[in-house]
């Protein structure tokens, strides 16, 4: 029973990792087969020069106005309310409810529920 459970977990991990590698490799462009024209190179260089000029202008303007250098941190209203609670676990759960997606919530709850079951199965052997 433990061997089959271990084998299943290894297979699931391999499938998930191969799926991620396949998704990353399919998004990459094969640059060896594409020809690069001179017009395209000139255009890229012009865009880079323009971007560098914009960065220089922006850096001089931020030196003049120091308020632009400060980070603006805003939090959702639900997160502020969740942080005000005295219960640490309750506050953590409310914060996770605001921040996490449904998929993340599912995996967190599944881990919390399945970990004691797996520990009992291993300990009973």
Curated annotation (Swiss-Prot):
Signal peptide: 1-23
Glycan attachment positions: 85
Record keywords: Glycoprotein, Host endoplasmic reticulum, Host membrane, Membrane, Secreted, Signal, Transmembrane, Transmembrane helix, Virulence
Chief subcellular location: secreted
Motif RxLR-dEER in this chain: 43-73
Membrane-topology descriptor: Single-pass membrane protein
Localization of this protein: Secreted; Host endoplasmic reticulum membrane
GO CC list: extracellular region; host cell endoplasmic reticulum membrane; membrane
Transmembrane segments: 106-123
Keyword 4Fe-4S in record: no
Keyword Chaperone among record annotations: no
Induction of the gene: Expression is up-regulated during the early plant infection stages.
Domain notes: Has the canonical translocation RxLR motif, but lacks the canonical EER motif, which characterizes most oomycete effectors identified so far.
Function, in words: Secreted effector that does not suppress pattern-triggered immunity (PTI) in plant host.
Entry protein name: Secreted RxLR effector protein RXLR-C13
Gene that this polypeptide is encoded by: RXLR-C131
